[in-house]
Amino acid sequence: MPSRRQFIGITGASALAAAAPTRLQAEAARSNNDSQTQGYRPVRTLNGWTLPYTLKDGVKEFHLRAEEIDHEFAPGTQAKCWGYNGSTPGPTIEVVEGDQVRILVTNALPEHTTIHWHGIILPSGMDGVGGLSQPQIRPGETYAYEFEVQQHGTHMYHPHADEMTQIAVGLMGMLVIHPKQPEAKPADRDYCFMLHLSLIHI
């Protein structure tokens, strides 16, 4: 398990089959999140993007890939980080209260990881606490989180495996759960913006 200093020297994770969509692929598949077909107004993540899904037997299936990335904090300022599907913060996941969801998480990192769905009501085995509520997701493995969404609100996802390091280097994202009953006065626009402080020595 690398220290924060050692992390800078990590050159890359093992190459795995890339089932997880990238930002460009997600933008091409934006129709998944059209308000006319989904019954809600999609959020716009100002410093991110929305993860598309496929519908399989009534289950919304998403793919996340934890991996090392090159992240540009500002023009000319780039650093090695960890992220999901090529970005940090990771893509925003949008679902609706009452949805049955399956989120397949592939670990392309050099150490084990998990995903904890912060503030979400779900079965203990889906809560993402490695070694307690589930096995650690080891390098090269894929773990399936599957649960029914029982509430609405704005939440986040992040690891519960060496979280002081893994969150610090970029593993986090937004989870937006739309209410089953539409708002009486829907907003014209709905935005997400995730704040994360990074200290870079240049």
Locate each region found by the language model.
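Short, well-ordered alpha-helical segments in soluble proteins
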Residues: E163, P179-E183, L197
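Conserved small/polar residues in nucleotide/adenosyl-binding loops
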Residues: I200-I202
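Low-complexity, Pro/Ser/Thr- and charge-rich linker/hinge segments at domain boundaries
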Residues: V176-C192
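C-terminal segment of N-terminal export signals and the immediately downstream linker at the start
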Residues: P21-E61
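N-terminal secretory signal peptides and thylakoid transit peptides that target proteins
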Residues: M1-A15
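Histidine- and aromatic-enriched segments that form or immediately flank copper-ligand environments
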Residues: E61-I177
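Short amphipathic
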Residues: K60-E67, R189-L195
